[in-house]
Amino acid sequence: MTDETTKNGPDATAADAAADAAAYVENDTVQEETAQPDPLELLKAENSELRDRYLRLAAEMDNLRRRTEREVKDAKSYSVAGFARDMLAVSDNLRRALDAISPEAKATADAGLTSLIEGVEMTERAMLSALERHGVRKLEPVGQKFDPNFHQAMFEVPNSEVPNNTVVQVVQAGFTIGERVLRPAMVGVAKGGPKPAEAETNSVFDEKDA
């Protein structure tokens, strides 16, 4: 055999195949190493996801806390609504008793009647004060623009000196409890006066907090 035959013989072919196989394995190993994600990047991604979950959970807990506080506050504020509404009937009767006494009768009343009148007035004031301590407040609508959210119009009063729909008389007092109307005020409103100003009026609650 010649040297050329020896180089190109079966041994050379086997050596080439082995070299190709080794190169393939090495290349595949490099590709696998390249395809594996960076552990640091994985930790960063996991940390970011956990942080997002924490922020969402914190926001949900804060909303739950606020909602619970509001519900507890409302429960305390409005738990006496039924009782307060019943007490308004008593207050109405006290006011009717006082209104039934004319100014002339008061002026000429003897000591006994005067004491009785003063006692009823003190009782009415004490009752309103007790209701106010529990968040029940009396509306004072005379002179205000009629607001159907707080007033119930019973009749119209011809009056050219004040704007139309101005409350000029209260038939039955109205009350609020917290941010709600416990009972609207029954009122008489002016008719025949100038057109009311277009400017917006503050609500009863805004005026109370001012």
Curated annotation (Swiss-Prot):
Places the protein is found: Cytoplasm
PROSITE patterns registered for this protein in UniProt: GRPE (PS01071)
One family name in Pfam for this protein: GrpE
UniProtKB keywords: Chaperone, Cytoplasm, Stress response
Region (Disordered): 191-210
Gene Ontology molecular functions: adenyl-nucleotide exchange factor activity; protein homodimerization activity; protein-folding chaperone binding; unfolded protein binding
Keyword Chaperone appears in the UniProt entry: yes
Record's GO cellular component terms: cytoplasm
Signal sequence, start to end: none
Matching PANTHER family: GRPE PROTEIN, GRPE PROTEIN HOMOLOG, MITOCHONDRIAL
Record's subunit section: Homodimer.
Functional summary from the UniProt entry: Participates actively in the response to hyperosmotic and heat shock by preventing the aggregation of stress-denatured proteins, in association with DnaK and GrpE. It is the nucleotide exchange factor for DnaK and may function as a thermosensor. Unfolded proteins bind initially to DnaJ; upon interaction with the DnaJ-bound protein, DnaK hydrolyzes its bound ATP, resulting in the formation of a stable complex. GrpE releases ADP from DnaK; ATP binding to DnaK triggers the release of the substrate protein, thus completing the reaction cycle.
Family: Belongs to the GrpE family.
Annotated protein name in UniProt: Protein GrpE
